[in-house]
Amino acid sequence: MDITKHTRALFVTTMLALGILVAGVAIGACGDDDGAAGEGAAQTAVGNGIDRAFVADMTPHHRSAVQMAKIAERRGQRRFVKDLASDISRTQNAEITTMQRIASRLDAAGVKAASLGIPEHQMGMDTDLSKLRTADPFDRAFIDMMIPHHQAAIRMGHVELAKGSSAEAKRLAKQIIAAQTREIEAMNKHRSEEFGGPSPAGGVPAQDENEGGEGDDGMSSKDHG
């Protein structure tokens, strides 16, 4: 038997086996990387902590606006206020439904709420509905209460646009900003015409207000679930 030929054949066979083994390990590793990348992409597509905070904070904020609008539909003294209240109620109820859908998707993906970074006093949630029910003149009181409420929603929308990642939440934020910007301008115009000047709350907030906030992993002080 030719020992040299046998040794060479054994060497070649061994190297081929090692090559197949290495290739298999490499393919497996690539598969793991692809899986991890896929999971990461899916998470990004669903949204991040800012998206979750945006819908968590905006949903009760919208409900508060709808409550105010319902009072205005009954007590409004001028057609402008009654029509505006009806529009707010219809639009924001529809947006609440959209936010609930977004929240369900984020919750299913395990996304936890971060913080929008907006001070509590700028969130527009300190509305006194009992005071509004007895206000006189009602229309002026309604405008003076709804404008800061809208300002808060616009601030939240700007944070979502700056730091959120959900395409659907961003579309909603743009929609909210556009609608409530128009409404603030219309309310101040009406107040100036009927009551001698715009609301002391001011006008549309600047875009760069409160676009900060914690990162995606920063938890809100509220437990949004």
Predicted regions and their residues:
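Bacterial N-terminal signal peptides that target proteins for export
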Residues: 3-16
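Hydrophobic alpha-helical membrane segments, chiefly transmembrane helices and signal peptide h-regions
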Residues: 17-24
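C-terminal motif of bacterial Sec signal peptides marking the signal peptidase cleavage site
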Residues: 25-29
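All-alpha RGS (Regulator of G-protein Signaling) helical domain and cognate RGS-like helical scaffolds
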Residues: 31-225
